[in-house]
Amino acid sequence: MKKKLTGASFGILGDSYSTFAGHITEGNNIYYPRPAAVDDVLNVEQTWWHLLMTRNNMRLLANDSFSGATICTDVRPGHVVANAYPARAERTFSGDIQPDYIFLFGGTNDNWLDKTIGQVQYGNWTEDDLKRTLPALCYVLDYLVKKNPQATIVVPINTGFKPELHEGMLEAAAHYGAVAICLADIDKKSGHPSALGMQQIAQQIAQQIEEALQ
């Protein structure tokens, strides 16, 4: 662990949970705000990352979150491979911005869409390997670590994942020296964090990072 949260800079590589209109990479799919589905997350200040940022006087350098995105490159209908996590990691975290923290928050769509989980794999990835979630996650972690050696990589793991996905994400995070955050009891509406859920995510991330610092 290289730096405490207080005053740190950070970037996000995420999915719908981390989107908010006007606050993500231009052209990315947006989920929040969506009052018809989540009626109480209406302002960017209510998102998990903005709460974390405000409470810890942090600076957001990039939020490359894309609603509906999978970690693996076997993307959902209507998406292209460039929407998946490997291509977006290369686009946004190639080493130019050098954040203190990178939050790699994903896997929810892989889990919902029953994508092939596969096994952890720490090198020699082929295009077919990246169509499976755990090899693709390892590829992304490997890229982030190599291009951003100054950064602490944080991997929040959503609730409700298949056990083999949850355990594989823990194993991959440990291999790459990332901090895995095991989220628990997150309040949701239509499968997405409510205002309370966003607060819970921010609190659990901060608490578990603090524990990892000790």
Give names to the regions the model predicted:
Residues 81-214:
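Alpha-helical cap/lid subdomain in secreted, periplasmic
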Residues 9, 60, 150-152:
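Residues at the starts of beta-strands that form the adenosine-phosphate
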